[in-house]
Every structure is written in structure tokens, then in C-alpha cells.
Amino acid sequence: MNATALARNLIRQLIEFGVSDFVLSPGSRNAPLSIALHEAESAGLINLYVKIDERGAAFFALGISKASDNYVAVICTSGTAAANYHPAALEAYHSENKLLIITADRPARLRQTGANQTTLQDGLLAPLDTVDIASAIVISDRLREGPVHFNVQFDEPLLPADEGDWLKGLAPHPKYRNSAREAVSIEVKPRGLLIVGHDRAGFEVGSISKLARDLSWPLIAEDPLSFPQAISHASLFFSDPELRSTFKPEQIIVIGRTTLSRSINALISECSDVIVIDPRTERIDIKREASQILTSLPEVIASPDSDWLAKWNQLSEFAQKNISLEWSEQLVISTITKNLPNDSALFIGSSRPIRDVEAFAAPRTGVHTFANRGLAGIDGNISTAFGIAERYQRTFAILGDVTFLHDISALANPTSADLTIFVIDNDGGGIFSTLPQAKVEGFEKIFGTPHHLDLERVIAGFGGVVTRVKSASDLIHSIIHPSQGLKFVVIEVPDRLTNADKLKEVTQSLVSALRMGSNLA
């Protein structure tokens, strides 16, 4: 089978399967795929995006996949181009996102011969398995769960010898949906606690909310923007061992990965009866202490204790009333998340922003939240936000300045969607000032990493629309009066050391207030 026929066969099958979004990086060896994709786009069958940087292209595709829950294909030429997909491939693997990576390759006979732009691409994106393709295959049984790597061998000639009517009669089939998992039934204790990780183990918010109602237990959510009944600021006040002891549950159900808060993980570790629910192959039970592991949301046999739930709800209300924030990164997060419009999307950058959302955002609904929590990296965050924005009328992103600069090349090929990116400018890696590393010698050089850049000028250099804000009122104005298209809001906050001190003060003040409430602790 020649290169043109092989490429057309693959693209035709993908379209029939329901793949509608393709992200292409230009190259020579992937020319058969590039030409086939252009023809499919011209026929109105697919959405084709072209990104020159493979690393950013993969994260862009990952963003579309996160927002659509459908396979999105990303295509490149051979050699180092393929290696640039590895960060996004790892994130997709650990998040089980539907990312289809297609790398073009030379024929197998040219491997390890010194042929130009040729390396061993089979296994290049481990732990992803590689499907090495030299002739037509049936792809439908390959696209089931999580990311997939197709490595396609193209021999010369790479250009079509005829026009061909290969798209005639082509129609997408219904998109693949995950098969339902058999529900189990479990008996639960009256004084329990439901804890939901940010990724929710892939379960729908509505399904988890139903489980919470059936349990009649309090709920702690790493994503408070999806669960209005969540206990407010729990990760802050449960840093206190006395409060953890006072509110110690008889049983905990954990859904997904809880990776943001040491205090919540301490609460889990101190409970003798923990049930973990996660359908993925990597079980989310870091200390191997779970008494039971389930792969689906169970039916529950419950004997609710109304006093237990009321006690927790009272705690949550008291926490909301007794948290006081000055202008800081914490107030920035609280202000943004409170004022986001309904039915908008929010991408939350790794490191400090996602932890502050978990700790300081008031529980609410109406916001579709996304984050790269598979490996929690700071790379590719702008590109991921660009991809998510392709699927929503209004999208927002919150990034730290180092995270922003790490993917700055994405601005060379920006999205045209309505996206506002908030950049928290504290001149360096703010999270390290809140960790034990803050006290080591040489901290600023090896952890703080100040960049000393004028981010407004950097963004303007890419032709971006940018404003700088220094107050909550200006920040609110930038949210409720957004301009169309891509917009950047650089947020000037106190220095990193001051922010770390404010975080300690807020936490200690809240803990003291809750401990003094005689009816709460």
C-alpha cells in the first residue's frame, strides 16, 4: 500500500469513527496525512488546526479532548518532532484523556541505518503502547480508553499520483461512549465523609451529587466550583490536628485523586475505614490503606445521622463567615471564582493557583472546570487553555507567571476564541515560598527563580490585548466586562514572601475562630 492510500485509509476510518478534530504540525514525512486532512477539511468533514510547535500542538489537542471527551488527533513528522509530544502524552495517560497521537515515520528497513530524521519511534512515548502501522489496519478496537500512539510508516513517494474520490459517501458514525460499569451495593456508616478529587475519577458531577444525597454525608471537594454543597475552606482548617480529631468520620469514601492538600490527605490517613472509587488502572490509594476499592459509583444502604451532617454544615457556614482576606493571591482567586459567569469554562494552572482555588473559592455551580492534574505539570498550560476555549463560548484561565512563561511560545499562534487569561505576577515560583524549601540557603536562585520581566510588554510583543490590575474592583471589572477574543489580565500581587505570610495568617485566624466556637469544636 503506497503512502497516499495508507494515509487516506487511516483518516477515513478516524472520521467514520467520529474523530472530528485534528491538530497538525507541518513536516515532510507526514505529507500524506497533511494532504488527506486538507482534503477532508475542504469537504467539511473535520476541523483542522495547524500549530508549528509540536509540544504546544499536543497540549492544544489535549485541551479540546478534555472539553469534548472525544478523541482528538495530533499529527507530526518523524524524529524530534515526535518526541515533543511526550509531556502531553504523559498528562493524557495519567488523566486518561482521549488523545490520539499520530507520528509519521520512515519505513522500518531504514531504522538504525543512519537515515535522515529517523529514530526508534516505537515506544518513544512510553508508557503509551505504540501501534506500528505499515499497512491498513482496523482502528476501531484501538480507540477505547485513554491516549493512543499510532506510528505510521510512509515510504516514498509521499505525494498523491491522482486526485482520487476517496471521501465519497463518507459519514461519521456515532461517537464511542464508555461502556457502563456494573454498580455494586455497599452498606455505609452513619457518620461518614465523601471526599472528591479534582479529576472526579472521570465521573459526572450529577452522578457524584446523587451519591452524596443518598449518603447524607458532608462532602469535601478539591473542585468547589462544581459542588455547591461542599464544605468551605476545609483544607485550611483541617491543618489543625484538634479539628481533625473533633470531626473525625467513621468512614470515608474517596472518589478520584486527592493530590492538592496535605491536611485532607491526613484526614484520610487517620480514618480506619476508607473506600476508594476509581475505574482507572492506577488505583488512587497512595498509602495502600483502603479497606475497599471500587471501579463504579455504588448503590448505598445508608442510615443517615442528621446531626452529623448539620454539624458539618454549621462548620462550613462558620468558616465562610470568619475568613477575611486582604489584597493577595488568595483574594484574587476568591474574587475571580465568585464572579465568573454561569456556563463559562475555567482552566486552572498547576502549582499555587489550583491549590488556592481548592482552599479559597466559595462553593458554587455554573463553571466547567479543567486542569492538567494527571502529572500536575506547568508546561503547555496556555495551549491547553486554547484547546478548551474552542469548545466554550466564554473561557477563563488562571496561571502563575512562571507557568505562563513556560508556554509563552503558544502566543505565536493564538486562539481566536473568547478567552481571558489571568496571570498572577509575583515575579517567580510563589508556591515554594509556602513550602519548607523557603528556608534553604540560595532559595531565590534555585527555587524562587525571579524572572524580572514586564509581562505586559512581553504579551504586547506578541500582539496581545493586555491590562494590568492591582485591586479587587479592577479585577471584577475585567471579568464582568470582557472584551471579545483573546485577552490577558496581568494581576499585580504582593511579593512571594508577603503572600506566604498572609496564607499562614489567614489559616491560623480561621483555625482559632473555629476552635473558639464552642458549638463547633
Tell where the protein language model's regions lie, with residue ranges:
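Phosphate/pyrophosphate-binding active-site segments
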Residues: M1-N2, L267-I354, V466-A521
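Conformationally flexible catalytic loops at phosphate/diphosphate-handling active centers
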Residues: R29, L125, I139-P190
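Glycine-rich, anion-gripping cofactor-binding loops and their flanking helix/strand elements
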Residues: L62, K66-A67, S78, N84, ...
